[in-house]
Amino acid sequence: METVQLRNPPRRQLKKLDEDSLTKQPEEVFDVLEKLGEGSYGSVYKAIHKETGQIVAIKQVPVESDLQEIIKEISIMQQCDSPHVVKYYGSYFKNTDLWIVMEYCGAGSVSDIIRLRNKTLTEDEIATILQSTLKGLEYLHFMRKIHRDIKAGNILLNTEGHAKLADFGVAGQLTDTMAKRNTVIGTPFWMAPEVIQEIGYNCVADIWSLGITAIEMAEGKPPYADIHPMRAIFMIPTNPPPTFRKPELWSDSFMDFVKQCLVKSPEQRATATQLLQHPFVKSAKGVSILRDLINEAMDVKLKRQEAQQREVDQEEEENSEEDELDSGTMVRAAGDEMGTVRVASSMSDGANTMIEHDDTLPSQLGTMVINTEDEEEEGTMKRRDETMQPARPSFLEYFEQKEKENQINSFGKSVPGPLQNSSDWKVPQDGDYEFLKSWTVEDLQKRLLALDPMMEQEIEEIRQKYQSKRQPILDAIEAKKRRQQNF
């Protein structure tokens, strides 16, 4: 579909919506074509600008969402004018929704492409994407902005292969008097150590996330993706920097690039400008090398949409016959409307990178989670109110909620007597686990699920002990900062 757009370009380029367009109802200015998925705070749709024929993306955000965060996202996009950052065209209020009109990137995110093709990327493809991404980061950092959620799901490609940074739902602005931020924000597996530790961070936090993203593009998932996210949060600051699972598969130049990104000390970590001069990036090929993988991904997507549409048509045909019998008012299901929304669900796997264990890296952690029937309201993790307890990072609340849901789902069923209460089970001494051989697979799986709440309790106790020692130090630092004129 998008290749046709290349052959029939818009009548003129849309740069910004004029005052006349902004005073109209959005339906008078745009035709909404289909739902693309979920971004931070709202649903994202593909639409066409009637006057120019240009395809755009529209994020529809419910007004009851965190308006401060939405306004901040718009503000950051408004200030950006770079070919490597998704453009902002304007916004509307429509009923209870805010419509944010943005640049459309027809090939989707890098993680979409990996998942659709069921293949990771080559070094040449990674180098080309990293070069554009670094140019976008260099621009943002020059503007004193931190993206704070760099990952393959937030790097979008247009149909020509140009990479652009997207989803500023958690981005932050640095001022001269606030050289470092102290909020924990982002997606856990990509977080820099200093972000997790809440010791203050600056623009190079994005560089750590970029290094993790490079591994993600090469291996299909970030380091620690196979373990519980809360364990990863404790491991990232304490363990040595992660590296490739099979280093022998990758060139010295690529491994050195990742090594320079994943330096634990932010003061010694390379900047975007410095990394643009790295041999791995300087030798990157043109965007034309990405066209084959983009076309392949779009072909897969189209075939899935066609297959899904056939299923929808068949369901509607069957349902319409039942509706005619059941009710005189519902003669027939609205075929066109159903088709538009349901087609998008052909990507219902989620827009994250290809992950073998979905329960380890849930789709909610990825920006642009493609529309699924049971995950309609989930997107990138949102930043919580900074006035809340600083000792309780926002991602902990998220994971605790997921644990509660898992426990309700798992333990609502009949469980054998010995497994009813996880706290009743004591860990065997001296590693004597022979008795487990007599258990059924079902009992073993239930026991494994029961271990998670025990682990959470132990982690919480450690966190509280750590916080009791850490908080006085943080208070002293904050007091000194307040006495300083400039940081």
Curated annotation (Swiss-Prot):
Residues annotated as the enzyme's active site: D149
Documented activity regulation: Inhibited by the C-terminal non-catalytic region. Activated by caspase-cleavage. Full activation also requires homodimerization and autophosphorylation of Thr-183. Activated by RASSF1 which acts by preventing its dephosphorylation.
Comp. bias regions, Acidic residues: 313-326
Keyword RNA-binding part of the UniProt annotation: no
Domain of life: Eukaryota
Listed GO CC annotations: cytoplasm; nucleus
Known catalytic reactions: L-seryl-[protein] + ATP = O-phospho-L-seryl-[protein] + ADP + H(+); L-threonyl-[protein] + ATP = O-phospho-L-threonyl-[protein] + ADP + H(+)
PROSITE patterns associated with the record: PROTEIN_KINASE_ATP (PS00107), PROTEIN_KINASE_DOM (PS50011), SARAH (PS50951)
Name of this protein: Serine/threonine-protein kinase 4
Classification of source organism: Eukaryota, Metazoa, Chordata, Craniata, Vertebrata
GN (gene name): STK4
